Amino acid sequence: MGERKGTNKYYPPDFDPAKHGSLNGYRNSHPLRERARKLSQGILIIRFEMPYNIWCDGCKNHIGMGVRYNAEKKKVGNYYTTPIYRFRMKCHLCVNYIEMQTDPASCDYVIVSGAQRKEERWDMQDNEQILTTEHEQKQRLETDSMFRLEHGVQDKAKLQRAAPSLSELQEVQSAWKDDFAINSLLRSKFREEKKQIKEEEERDQALLTKASLDLKLVPEVEEDKKIAALLKYRSLESYEQKQKKKRSEICNRSWFSPGVDSGQQAPGNTMRKLGIRTKTPSVPGISPVSLGVVRRTSKEENKAEDKSVESPDGSRSRKAEGMCRKEETGCKEEITERTQSECKLNTELTLTTSTLAAQGQTPTIHTVSCLVPNYSDSSCESEG
């Protein structure tokens, strides 16, 4: 488009280059258009940017540095050969006009009217900035040799005071001198960290897959390891440690039971400790009489006995009745004794079985049936 604008301009038929010179002269216009409407007065409209913070005198509002205005630019004088320009602009918050102009002597802008500057300046010497050489001082350095010598001594003293800071800055800069080596070292470090992160992610993903979980794992820390170790529900000792502990207990264990004299121990205990199995004595045979079982008599025998003990007048004799009571009491005493002996025998069998199991031998189990006699229809029961 720019190329077409330069080559495809329309020249009317009455255009005379000797008379008009250019199309702008033919149309009586300026290339800057509206910006040059006051050019006859020496005023050019430009875009001015506020150089520092100010307060407007009309509305007392704050105008920040960098705010732009359409300002009228006008030349008002010279500083030596440097022109001094004045800028006039309207506040965007009120109808007040602000005027500012350049100050080439101090390389700054000065407010002429309409505003006040927000004072944020400081002494360049106190702030350790580079000072601009004054014109008078420059002329004196060129003409006065003694002043130049004193100024050189001051510069050397200042250099000695700044030497440690300068050397420190040089060391910092030298660290970044070989940028290729530093970049290679940094990239290798990044690759190692990336590899570690990838391994941790794979390990975490395998753990989540194994546990069928769908959550984000946080990085593991040493404190979490200690807490997790305390929450384990299994022994912390390994299989080898358990076996070693068990062997040491067996080696340190006494061959003789505590509280029993070695001379009073039975030979069977020594045989068990040596690992020699002995034949377990069998339990003596149990007969129905030892268990207190009473054989029932038939009805015919009961009738015969009743007839033999009845008196001629048809009543049971006192003698027969006393014999029955005596027989019944004897049966009950015999049953009580048999029951106590059976309980004692069962207790001995239980103790023997537990002892053999503790010593690693297979106990011989003997089943003892407990028969309960029924005396509801015995011959000793009194009738009607």
UniProtKB/Swiss-Prot annotation:
Compositional bias segments (type: Basic and acidic residues): 297-331
A GO biological-process term: RNA splicing
Residue numbers spanned by region Disordered: 1-28, 275-331
Subcellular location: Nucleus
Swiss-Prot/TrEMBL keywords: Coiled coil, Nucleus
Coiled coil segments of this chain: 183-212
Keyword Nucleotide-binding: no
Cellular component terms per the entry's GO annotation: post-mRNA release spliceosomal complex; U2-type spliceosomal complex
This protein's record includes keyword Coiled coil: yes
A Pfam family this chain is assigned to: Saf4_Yju2
Matches recorded under InterPro entries: Saf4/Yju2 (IPR007590)
Broad class of the protein's primary localization: nucleus
Family: Belongs to the CWC16 family.
Known role: May be involved in mRNA splicing.
UniProt-recorded name of the protein: Probable splicing factor YJU2B
Organism the protein comes from: Xenopus laevis
